[in-house]
Amino acid sequence: MQFFNFLLFYPVFMSIYWIVGSIYFYFTREIRYSLNKKPDINVDELEGITFLLACYNESDTIEDTLSNVLALKYEKKEIIIINDGSSDNTAELIYKIKENNDFIFVDLQENRGKANALNQGIKQASYDYVMCLDADTIVDQDAPYYMIENFKHDPKLGAVTGNPRIRNKSSILGKIQTIEYASLIGCIKRSQTLAGAVNTISGVFTLFKKSAVVDVGYWDTDMITEDIAVSWKLHLRGYRIKYEPLAMCWMLVPETLGGLWKQRVRWAQGGHEVLLRDFFSTMKTKRFPLYILMFEQIISILWVYIVLLYLGYLFITANFLDYTFMTYSFSIFLLSSFTMTFINVIQFTVALFIDSRYEKKNMAGLIFVSWYPTVYWIINAAVVLVAFPKALKRKKGGYATWSSPDRGNTQR
């Protein structure tokens, strides 16, 4: 029974941890700031920001994103676009926009991955702070002000990651991911910030201190997820990462099952690659928040394989004609379902209440309250089974290239 308790209550424990962390973060750090007023900053003392946009086959989105960044009213900005050997007409579109606008364009002829593209861009950055954006990102006007303000109070802050919102919500998958980001990912980021270490910045929207990125050796070109990899390099060098929910951007998410599956496998593989690379280095740090993050990843992987082994054992040894066995199994199933549903209701309600400050209409997502987090754990389990073997086979020293992403539709 104790073994079963671990299988059942590990997801429950993590959900409770995220709920408590989110509530505490909201009332101590978030609610006191107004969304309608940007931080009071003296323009003469304002730090400059270099905006880095790395793109590969982004002809459908690059014009909107580049136009948005050009229109930002942030007083001290520099824009660098890096085309990573696109095979479509992305480069031609950027050259056309450049005819009437002032920005730096780095046109790489060979696709060598996002990390390599960012490395090429940051080496040309003039300012001490670098904002990395994906090529489908639309940034709110006040977001850079909220993010840069954090660096004034913490000299060891290496990066501030923002609050990505979803633009394409017309499809069922788009709506579900909107609720996922609001209720699950937002909870996790808030809780991890309180604990002292955020597992990963958001690759779509993060402001870095340039000297910190240089100090850790830039982005890794051979890691499948450059954002997770650089996050842990920053942690291991003693830098902090902070989540800033007031700094919002708008992005596109996959709207096909194939695109979503490919994205989630890539995310999981990237996390596992970092786990395999940085485990022993993390153990030497004597930093408890990093221990929590590392063991959370390890236990999540072990949980998946143990669940599968346990279910396989039950199936092989089951006596389906035994009334006592069937009654016991059914009661366990009911207990599991009730416990997970009860915790899910609490987590969704709390998370969507907090998130309603940014998008009130997301409260309609309570329709998913009873089942989605359970599905989330099942999907993650399937993803781990595919991603972990891929991480074990990672080739060091090469280039982790990217393919054309599933951006869905562009409506907001």
From Swiss-Prot:
Record's family? Belongs to the glycosyltransferase 2 family.
Where mainly found?
Answer: membrane
- Read off the Gene3D superfamilies from this record: Spore Coat Polysaccharide Biosynthesis Protein SpsA, Chain A
Q: Give one GO molecular function term.
A: acetylglucosaminyltransferase activity
Q: Could you name the Gene Ontology cellular component terms for this entry?
A: plasma membrane
Name its cellular compartments.
Answer: Cell membrane
In Gene Ontology terms, what is a biological process of this protein? cell adhesion involved in biofilm formation
**Which keywords does the record carry?**
Cell membrane, Glycosyltransferase, Membrane, Transferase, Transmembrane, Transmembrane helix
Q: State its Enzyme Commission number(s).
A: 2.4.1.-
Q: Which CDD domains match?
A: CESA_like
Q: What is this protein called?
A: Poly-beta-1,6-N-acetyl-D-glucosamine synthase
Gene expressing this chain: icaA
- Transmembrane segment boundaries: 6-28, 290-312, 332-354, 366-388
**The organism's taxonomic lineage, starting at the top:** Bacteria, Bacillati, Bacillota, Bacilli, Bacillales
Q: According to its UniProt record, what is one Pfam family this protein matches?
A: Glycos_transf_2
Query: What is its membrane topology?
Result: Multi-pass membrane protein
- Please give the function described in this protein's UniProt entry: N-acetylglucosaminyltransferase that catalyzes the polymerization of single monomer units of UDP-N-acetylglucosamine to produce the linear homomer poly-beta-1,6-N-acetyl-D-glucosamine (PNAG, also referred to as PIA), a biofilm adhesin polysaccharide. Requires IcaD for full activity.
